[in-house]
A protein has these predicted regions:
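Beta-propeller domains
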Residues: 6-10, 17, 43-80, 117, ...
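Short active-site oxyanion
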Residues: 23-26, 44-47, 107-108
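Short coil/turn segments at the loop-to-beta-strand junctions that recur within blades
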Residues: 32-35, 71-75, 134-139
Length: 166
C-alpha cells in the first residue's frame, strides 16, 4: 500500500517550520508508568492519567498526585514499579484504567477499566465505584475506552467478548 501526504512532500520535511511536531517535547518521562489515557476536568485542570498500577493520577502543576483508585483490593502488590511490564501479573487485582472521560455537568470521572468494566469517581477522587460490568447480559471482558455525549450518554468499547488483557 502506498500513501501520499495530501499536504505535499514539503510538509513531511524535517526542517519545515509548519511541522508543529518539531516543537514538541516529551513531558513526564519516567514519572508515570504506562499512561493509557489522559483527560482534563470540566474546569480545565489536569491532565489526569490512568496508569499501569491501577491508579488515576492528577498533575497539580508541580507533581503527580493520586486522584483515584480502580480496585477495592489495592495492596502493596500494586505499588509503583520501575517498568510498566512489572504490573501485568497483578493487573486483574490492581485494575488497569484504559479510558478516561469527565462528565461535564457533574464533574464525575468515568473510567474504562480492562478488568472491572465501567467505573465512576466523583470530582473529589477516591475509590471508583462500578457503573456496569456487563452489557445486555454479556460480561465485559476488556473494557477499553469510552466517550460521553452532551446528554450524558456513555459510549464504550469492549475489545473482546472472550479474552481479558492478560
Amino acid at each position: 500500500m502506498k500513501w501520499t501526504c495530501p499536504l505535499g512532500p514539503r510538509f513531511l520535511q524535517r526542517e519545515n517550520p509548519e511541522n508543529l511536531l518539531q516543537k514538541s517535547e516529551i513531558k513526564f518521562l519516567n514519572q508515570v508508568q504506562g499512561p493509557e489515557s489522559v483527560a482534563f476536568d470540566p474546569l480545565g485542570r489536569g491532565p489526569y492519567a490512568g496508569v499501569a498500577d491501577g491508579r488515576v493520577l492528577f498533575w497539580n502543576g508541580r507533581s503527580w498526585t493520586d486522584f483515584a483508585y480502580t480496585s477495592p483490593h489495592r495492596s502493596d502488590i500494586c505499588s509503583p514499579k520501575p517498568s510498566p511490564l512489572s504490573y501485568l501479573k497483578n493487573e486483574h487485582i490492581c485494575g488497569r484504567p484504559l479510558g478516561l472521560r469527565f462528565e461535564k455537568k457533574t464533574g464525575d470521572l468515568c473510567i474504562a477499566n480492562a478488568y472491572f468494566g465501567l467505573l465512576k469517581v466523583g470530582p473529589e477522587g477516591g475509590l471508583a465505584t462500578p457503573l456496569t460490568t456487563e452489557a445486555e447480559g454479556v460480561p465485559l471482558r476488556f473494557t477499553n475506552d469510552l466517550d460521553i455525549d452532551e446528554e450524558g450518554n456513555v459510549y464504550f468499547t469492549d475489545s473482546s467478548t472472550t479474552y481479558q488483557r492478560r
